[in-house]
Amino acid sequence: MNVNEIIKGPILTEKSYQLMSSGVYSFKVSPKTNRSETKKAVEYIFNVKVEKVNIFTVPKKEKKLGKSKGFTTKYKKALVKLMPGYTINLFEDESPQDQKDSETVSENTEEKAKIAKKKAELEAKNKEIAEKLAKKQAELAKKESETNENQEKKIENQTENQENSAK
């Protein structure tokens, strides 16, 4: 039997996750296979050393959906115990994604820090500009008041001169 045809796929249940921590992995295998073929297939596909293989057939079970009754298909299940120090990464697609996620999280925190720093710098510049504007406005207001006073004095002087010349 071809090595790729022996293992149909992993069985991922709550119990199988608990067994994975102790180095036991569960697979759905071809009904025609035996222990030695399963051992060779796991060692070849996952590049690990297998200590022990247990195989058993899971019988069909009756299922009801509404009024209709049916059966699940029976299948062969293999529990494969690996030698100490070996593991199988069943989630190869997710591990690089997890690394990417952690990298993006660290990049996001760095970007947030940069943004916060730029924001603080901009706020400081805005404060300086606001102070300069306030000073200039105060100077302009002072000059305006001085020019208004000077104009008032000129007008008073002109009116006094006109009054004096009229007398």
Curated annotation (Swiss-Prot):
It comes from the Bacteria. One of its GO terms (biological process) is translation. Disulfide bonds: none annotated. Residues 119-167 are annotated as: Unknown. Residues 1-118 are annotated as: Large ribosomal subunit protein uL23. Keywords: Ribonucleoprotein, Ribosomal protein, RNA-binding, rRNA-binding. Belongs to the universal ribosomal protein uL23 family. One of the early assembly proteins it binds 23S rRNA. One of the proteins that surrounds the polypeptide exit tunnel on the outside of the ribosome. Forms the main docking site for trigger factor binding to the ribosome. This is Large ribosomal subunit protein uL23. The lineage of its organism: Bacteria, Bacillati, Mycoplasmatota, Mycoplasmoidales, Metamycoplasmataceae.
